[in-house]
Amino acid sequence: MSDIAITISLLALVAVIGLWIGHWKIRGVGLGIGGVLFGGIIVAHFTNQYGLKLDAHTLHFVQEFGLILFVYTIGIQVGPGFFSSLRKSGLKLNAFAILIIVLGSIAVVLVHKIADVPLDIALGIYSGAVTNTPALGAGQQILAELGVPQTTVTMGVSYAMAYPFGICGILLAMWLIRLFFKVKVDDEAARFNAESSQDKESLHNISLKVTNQNLDGLTLIQIPGFSDEEVVCSRLKRDDMEIVPKASTEIRINDILQLVGDDNSLAKMRLIIGYEVDAPTVAYSGEIRSERVVVTNEKVLGKKIRALGIHQKYGVVISRLNRAGIELVPTGNTTLQFGDVLHMVGRSDVLNQAISVIGNAQQKLLQVQMLPVFIGIGLGVLVGSIPFYIPGFPVALKLGLAGGPLVVALILARIGTIGKLYWFMPPSANLALREIGIVLFLAVVGLKSGGSFFDTLVNGSGLEWMGYGIFITFIPLMITGILARLYGKLNYLTICGLLAGSMTDPPALAFANEIKEDNGAAALSYATVYPLVMFLRIMSPQLLAVLLWAA
């Protein structure tokens, strides 16, 4: 067999062993995808003993391509929610997540300066302690740019030393915070449910009876609120007749309007129109129905709802729009993206015609447009290679192969559609590419670092590196968790999700969810901080490398 064939065969063997190890669980907690790293270490230990030669160029390509695949698909996944997570509702949670990252970075500086740990090893320990593999890739990239030799081996070994407690440390922090504040989980869950029901900003339906004499004879568009497109009127009931109103529909006293909007907008409409009636409007004789329709027609991508003329042509109202899990009130100026879910209301005989304009081809949601994938990857590599200069920094910074594809993917996923190209990827396809990428990357890191792992652990500084990893993992989590409880007044379950999200650690999220099942507090806070944290975890090793290398 050629060296390339041997190398690829061993990579497959590493993946099999590593994924098998990752499925081992103790009390529901396992290494997960991190098991691939240890699979690589085990295989590398024996390949060194038997003198098997691996092709260095193949390993290098597989490592870099795996990293690119992983960070790009992460960006596509979190892109739609990345910018919305920075809004007011997530500011407090993201602020505490940033604090964890800052404290962890300070801990790295202390380990490097006071304990005199080499920079590459310190960054490897940092990546393992926060269980973030893209951070490892980003650190290796920037150190290679700075001319530090053998970064893959030393960083891989130190990463592996710190990784196991990186997972366990999060769980320990959750447990200690619970003991310290004598938390009663059932009370926390009840408090979260009560607060979330009050603060929920999703859209609602109400039915209002027109009693304001000033509105009699006005068209719908002339009524304040409708002209501002704050709410949508999906149905109008007059006596025994029910219609889907148009902007030009005249309103009469005692008409019943079914409105869709947020609580504040609906409260304003009560003051303008009249009082709320208990019985919602219903469709008579099956003439009016509603459907949830997915935007899949390439001809409407990037177009405004007004330009489609659906309301004018078919008398169909789009009452709600769900984009990446966020409910919006659609307006005439709303631009449609692939995968948007529209709630459409209209007469049965014409609703299907309107649906055909939007698409609603479910099979398209299972397909992947490969052209946008490679455009995104190509642009990401290009952006990652562009140097930019910051005053006071000794060298030009680059986003690199870890940061470039991530930033480009975030932007493209947020834009959603350019012409007939759409940066939507089915969750199953995204997960598959992401898992392939991270498995390839970790397999190579394990193979490169495995030869010296056991010697470092037994005869070298392995145990010392583990101690530094515990310091970097545990101290920032405990400090932030206590501050979030004392001063942030955060719910304990929310704090657990915050800690798991700040480490981008799915096993920790699974543990947090099991603390109180059927409660979404942990998952919600995890999802809120995850996009920003993933971005900062990739950028922080690069900034630390440049700052500490120059110091």
Swiss-Prot record:
Record-annotated membrane-spanning stretches: 4-24, 28-48, 65-85, 95-115, 157-177, 370-390, 402-424, 438-458, 463-483, 492-512, 529-549
Single annotated GO MF: monoatomic cation transmembrane transporter activity
PROSITE patterns membership: RCK_C
Membrane topology recorded in Swiss-Prot or TrEMBL: Multi-pass membrane protein
Annotated RCK C-terminal domain residues: 191-275, 277-360
Annotated keywords: Cell membrane, Membrane, Repeat, Transmembrane, Transmembrane helix, Transport
Listed GO biological process terms: potassium ion transport
Gene Ontology CC annotation, any one: plasma membrane
Location within or outside the cell: Cell membrane
Entry annotated with the keyword Transmembrane helix: yes
Superkingdom per UniProt: Bacteria
UniProt xrefs under HAMAP family: YidE (MF_01016)
Family assignment from sequence similarity: Belongs to the AAE transporter (TC 2.A.81) family. YidE subfamily.
Protein name per its UniProtKB record: Putative transport protein NTHI0043
Lineage of the species this protein comes from: Bacteria, Pseudomonadati, Pseudomonadota, Gammaproteobacteria, Pasteurellales
